[in-house]
Amino acid sequence: QRNTAPLFNLSELKYLTAADSNIKTLIRQIDNPLFNEHPLEMGVRGHENEILERFKRDKFYELQFNKLKMPINWQNIKLTITKFVNSLKSYQSPYDQYLKGTYTMTDQQKRGMNLFYSDSLACSKCHSGINFSEPTFLNKNNKVEYYYNTGLYNVNEKNEYPQYDTGLSQVTHN
C-alpha cells in the first residue's frame, strides 16, 4: 500500500514513507507493519500478548535480551530492530567508491552514469539523494522540490485511484 523503504542505508533517509510525513523515526515506522490492520502485514494487532510470550519462551531471545540487560517487551523489540536496521550500510558499490575517489569507473560505467544524469532520460530528476530514493525532483529552475500526494482520487470516476486509500490526506485530513 505504501512505498516500502529500503533496509540498507535507512538511517540516511529524510522520509520513511511518502504516505505520512509525521513518521520521522524508524521506531515509529515499525508500528505500521507490526500493528496496522490495513494493510495487514505482520498481523500482530490483537495477538500482542501471545506473540510477546513466544519471544519470552524462546531461549535465543531470552539470552540476547539478557545480554542487553533489557526486558522483553514491544518497545525493546522495536528498539533492537531499529538498531539492527540502522547498522545496515551499503556504500561499497563502484559508484560509491568512485565518489570517494578510490575507484576509476570503466567506460561502460561512465556511459551509464552519463545516461542516468542526462536531460534526455532524466532518471536523476526523480531518483535523487544519497540513496537515489528521496521523494524529490528538480524543478525547471533546478531547485529541489518534494513529492506530495495530490489527492486526485476517482476524479475521472474510473476508480484509477482507490477511494479507500487517500495516502497522505488520510493522515493530514487536508
Language-model segments: which ranges?
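Periplasmic c-type cytochrome electron-transfer domains
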Residues: 1-174
